[in-house]
């Protein structure tokens, strides 16, 4: 509200979580632009994010800071904890706007994303466009009845359900693969990450088969792309890596659900191959599950939970195989799916851990 100096800090040293900064750089690439990259490791390793930030007018004074110390006579900083302070002389009521493009591939792609999405628009125009898109998405389901509070709860939950997964391909289709190479999507297709599969395979993914079949096909293709690189379907992928979080191999249920509901746009035979190979991986007690039909509770924590989710996923594989006419695979996984009976205790009508235990 008054004439004076206004500054914007681009702070690559700051993090909301306990991430390790592996590498970073900041560079002035135009009188009104700062670009750079930060590569971090935390839940997964190697999460490079490139950016290109353009101000609404040329920068008047640019101060570089590395490891807390001011650096002079440079247009680029390389290191880990980096900051840039862009300063402007402003009149009372004047606003400095900053348009930022991001990419997991390159600064060039970040700049292209920014120009594609934001060129010719100010903050208010972008805000109105975002509001319109959210209104369109939330209008995809219309409900009747219930109290005002219940309807607010419903649409709030629908909003939350649309925050992730994240589309990670750029406007030109390029994206960072799990081997850190660069892939490219086909025209009209998208590549997604942040697939919290253990949390979402039961309800969210089935809901999406009703709301957006093209999106579901993109999710399946994303999972198969990860399989092509790693030899295994994703469990809980983030950015360009795998967290390995939670139990089961629930990509198979997402793929089977899509196929059984008539959603195509991916190779069913390749999908079945990926499902079978992922189910044969020796992770989280799967070796006992495959060999013995149960997971000893004294050898593996979460043994019952792991078994039940393996069994459900195996049932999904059997259904997919049957739909594709692969009867041998269907029979094998249908038998594996019955492993749940090995931990069902009829005396209490509940599932219980099984193993060799010493009496106290």
Over which residues does each language-model region extend?
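Beta-sandwich/jelly-roll carbohydrate-recognition scaffolds of carbohydrate-active enzymes
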Residues: 1-192
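A generic secondary-structure signal for well-formed alpha-helical elements
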Residues: 2-6, 16, 20, 59, ...
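Short, solvent-exposed loop/turn and secondary-structure capping segments
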Residues: 109-111, 167-174, 206-209, 217-220, ...
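Short alpha-helical scaffolding segments that buttress acidic/His motifs in well-ordered protein cores
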Residues: 154-161, 223, 275, 337
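Glycine- and aromatic-rich loop/turn segments at beta-sheet edges
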Residues: 170-188, 228-239, 283-301, 345-359
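Aromatic-rich carbohydrate-recognition surfaces in CAZymes
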Residues: 193-321, 334
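Catalytic cores of carbohydrate-active enzymes
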Residues: 234, 318, 322-360
């Amino acid at each position: 509200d008054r004439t004076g100096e206004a500054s914007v800090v681009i702070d690559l040293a700051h993090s909301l979580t306990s991430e390790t900064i592996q590498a970073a750089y900041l560079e002035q690439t135009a009188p009104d632009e700062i670009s750079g990259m930060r590569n971090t490791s935390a839940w997964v390793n190697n999460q490079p994010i490139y950016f290109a930030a353009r101000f609404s007018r040329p920068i008047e004074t640019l101060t570089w800071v590395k490891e807390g110390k001011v650096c002079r006579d440079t247009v680029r900083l390389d290191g880990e904890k980096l900051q840039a302070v862009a300063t402007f002389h402003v009149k009372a009521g004047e606003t400095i706007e900053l348009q930022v493009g991001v990419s997991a591939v390159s600064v060039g792609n970040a700049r292209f994303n920014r120009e594609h999405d934001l060129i010719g628009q100010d903050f208010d125009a972008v805000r109105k466009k975002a509001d319109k898109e959210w209104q369109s998405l939330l209008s995809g389901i219309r409900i009747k009845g219930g109290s005002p509070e219940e309807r607010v709860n419903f649409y709030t939950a629908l909003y939350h359900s649309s925050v992730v997964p994240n589309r990670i391909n750029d406007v030109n289709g390029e994206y960072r693969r799990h081997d850190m190479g660069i892939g490219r999507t086909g025209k009209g297709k998208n590549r997604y990450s942040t697939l919290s599969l253990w949390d979402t395979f039961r309800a969210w993914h089935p809901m999406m088969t009703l709301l957006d079949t093209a999106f579901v096909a993109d999710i399946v293709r994303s999972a198969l792309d990860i399989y092509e690189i790693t030899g295994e379907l994703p469990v809980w992928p983030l950015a360009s890596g795998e967290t390995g979080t939670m139990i089961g191999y629930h990509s198979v249920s997402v793929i089977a659900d899509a196929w059984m509901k008539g959603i195509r746009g991916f190779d069913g035979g390749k999908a079945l191959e990926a499902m079978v190979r992922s189910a044969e991986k020796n992770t989280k007690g799967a070796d006992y599950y495959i060999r013995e039909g149960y997971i000893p509770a004294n050898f593996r924590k979460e043994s019952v939970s792991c078994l039940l989710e393996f069994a459900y996923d195996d049932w999904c594989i059997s259904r997919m195989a049957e739909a594709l006419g692969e009867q041998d695979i269907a029979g094998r996984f249908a038998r594996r799916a019955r492993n749940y009976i090995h931990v069902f205790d009829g005396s209490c009508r509940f599932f219980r851990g099984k193993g060799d235990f010493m009496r106290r």
